[in-house]
Amino acid sequence: MSQSNSNVQISKIAGREPDTSMPACEPVFWRVEGSLLNLTAVRPVGFFAWNSQSFLQRWTRRGAMATLAIARPFLYVTDRVFATRLLHTVLRGVSRDRLDLLGEEFFEYFLKPRLKARGIAKLNEAVAAGGEIILVSQGLDHIMRPLAKHLGVARIISNRLDFREGTATGRLLEPVIRPRGAFARFTQGQPDGRLSREKLIKVLGFEKNPEVMDEAIQPAGRPAPNVYVPVVHFESRNGRSSLSVRETLRGKNVLLIGATGFIGKVWLVNLLTDLPDIGRIYLLVRHNRAATSLQRFQRVIEESPVFEQLAERHGDRFAEFLRERIEVVDGDVSQPDLGLAAEAKQRLARSLDVIVNSSGLTDFNPDLRDALATNVRATAYTLDFLRECDRASLLHLSTCYVVGQRDGRVLEELPRNYTPCGIKDYDALKEWQSLENHVRETEARAESPEVTDELRRAALKKEHAAKDLQGAALENQIRKNRVRWLRQTLTDAASHRAMELGWPNTYTFTKSLSESLICNFLDANPAAAIAVVRPAIVESSLEKPFLGWNEGINTSASLSYLLGTFFRQLPSTETKCLDLIPVDLVSRGMTLISAALVARRHETVYQLATSVSNACNMRRSIELTGLGHRKFYRAQNGLEHRLRLKFDAIPVSKTRYKAFSAPTQKAIVQAINRTVEPFASRPPLARQQRELEKVIKLISLFEPFILHNDHVFEAANVDRLSAALPTNERADFGYDARALDWWDYWINVHIPALRKWCYPLIEGRQPEARPRRSVPLETRAESSAAEAKGATPAAAS
């Protein structure tokens, strides 16, 4: 991501406008063709056409160019403007996103090596003389912008395509910059490309309307999205007065549950960076057999890149800084009283102002026992603890996709006993108890003689097992099989029940159950201050803790990885929105909502999403993912990378996917394996069959989010909080999803972040190794004192 684009995007999200003012001086017009490059209009258009998204589009446009090649010389002689217009009709249907990326690529790999040194020297002389250079070219702005950036030029005159909904109509905008004459290459090849205003008007054929010259001058920077969605703010019970985050959270104590997670770590760093006057930050961390809670958190601090900049800022005092600001509390959110010791529980209940529960099991279809413990039981125990606190409020992190499998606009509301299917007599509390009972019954059934016999037969069925497995070895294998059987049975039961009620997976089902518990709690305790925060799909950071941070493979990483292979046909609905949001934008929202909770100016539900204010549909998401991969592969060497450039994924219907993609390919591979099975010791295409099965399973897992359920998530409540910020706090705490430039974010931030932090995990590798920091949070005296008290060592309060 270019520094200029990054600064513009970050400035807009923070609520401040970037400086785009131009110097007030007489400009110098500089013709690119002849002085800097020998550039024709045909070659870049041909490059764009040959690199269209689909194979059909490539050959269709190639054929159109071949046809034009016959007629264009005659048209060029009679009317150069019309010939130029006709040439660019070939690009009808190409997206602006693709043209912008291909324009950068064409300049970097084709034009940049061919720049004329003498012409650049002359241009630098003109710049040194104090004149503002305006590049003039017959080429499209998609090519001229990278050239201008390379030369440090701020404005250009070039041809521009008309776009409708991000797609080229094939029509050139006025004024059309006509090519030079037929012999200009031989008569106008001097390195000095300066033209007077009068001569340029004549050369371009603007004599009748010289005023169009000023209209033709455009900024050289890539235009940022101008997304404006009017929001009407009605007066509410909370009023419209200013909300200062710094003043509201000054001296306030926070308990963060889930500090070792993706969102939790980013929010913790933001608190430590942007709120120096906040009170004590307590972190609830569970110990394990190998490490105390403090040791676990210390390892996160020492190994996670999230804390690098904070560590560099404080240097040798980093550990001391953390001990002053943070206290690690041993506990377990899935246990009664949050697993806290009695003394710690009483102390926290008296002192806390905000509890932030960002814990959660994010696997789509986990073991039901794990899902209930982390997503449901943990919420119930957190609410019990909240009831015993003197003044604490609760920020509960959920997900937008608790809405389940239904279409339409999703309001910021907390319905009672909600199911996507609209079951009238559904009771969330009874459903939870039923699931807990099912777990106990299944655990008991796993020990039954019937299941044990089944597991024994399975153990002995394997090749050579009858003679190799006997006595203790056989019993040990049965025990392992029982663990797998129990896990698989409960996983299947949970996902089946979720789909039966209208949720796509266990994760969204159990997250919705936790919201129902909160709704019931608010009915019984109307004075309780609770905000349910629903982010959409949380992805790579835009600014904090640094540009392009991501972690894990539970969101879009696996799907985008697939689109970077030779896989081409993704079943999806083109107009459906894929609702992504950067993790640091979620963090900003959480900080705003925490302040609103403390000030008792909160709403019950906040959705942090982009589908209303800055939608990015599936068609565009798929193409941007492919363009992000293309930019990486184009910079690599090797035949495989060059081949992958040609395999852009495209959105297709489910019918076409089944007929021409992974399902049919799997059927063919299976048929081959069955045919040769009698003649081979093992199927020759067994690995390919397994890979195709993985692809089919992955597509099935993501179908609810890319093919079905067209959701539009309202997100007005957090916008109102951001609008209430005082001017001097908008840079640090302002929230504006409308300022996201999806092209820049996807290609220059998100895909590179996934490639750096997530794809290695998919490939069975570790992300790039970084030197481990030494951050001794636990002093020897503190450790001895904690052990003497029989408590888990933690930072001193």
Each language-model region and where it sits:
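C-terminal cap/substrate-recognition subdomain and adjoining C-terminal extension
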Residues: 2, 11-13, 23, 101, ...
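A conserved pocket-lining segment of Rossmann-fold NAD(P)-dependent short-chain dehydrogenase/reductase
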Residues: 484-505, 544, 548-585, 589-593, ...
